[in-house]
Amino acid sequence: FEQHNPHHNLDLFNHIISVVSKVPADLELRYTALLHDIAKPLVQTFDENGVAHYKTHEIVGADMARDILTRLKLPVKLIETVEDIIKKHMVLYRDVTDKKFNKLLSEMGYDNLLRLIEHCNADNSSKNNEVVNPENDLHERLKRAVEKQMQVTVNDLALNGKDLIDMGFKGTEIGKIKGELLDKYLSEEIPNEKE
């Protein structure tokens, strides 16, 4: 399947083989690499210059991967991880702000964001290097984001359990709210203030 896009110098089959060979030997990553572009033939469109585009291939591909891996009776956690990484595998190709990066870390957790980075690095290095720069600082950004998260816990939030009780919250609601506040703070959606 020819990709008809300047970002790719390999056909789809050889691109996938290249990505699979470049990801670390991790089962979730290997399945992700194998299936990440599976929807490209279904969603391919051409612009007026004859250049192919694959909008939504990551969304359609994540659904297809989930169906395939479910039929193979693989563990649910593995299926969910592969589906999530495929769904997000185009996110890191755009300029990702620190806020968005921290939000990804909060949503995915360290292990799966690291897998996403490893996948994207293998994917990028399997493209046309005259058009795509395979160099990035994603590993360093992950390290910085983790260090930031390790420095802040729910106990460091300006709004504490007593404040929430005074607002009328009870029991397990308090822990849930504090966890949500921490996630929002770490993804820079809110400041660490009582207001």
Please identify what each model-predicted range represents.
Residues D67-R71, S126-E195:
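Charged substrate- and nucleic-acid-binding regions of tRNA-handling and nucleotidyl-transfer enzymes
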Residues F1-N121, V131:
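Conserved, hydrophobic alpha-helical core segments of structured domains
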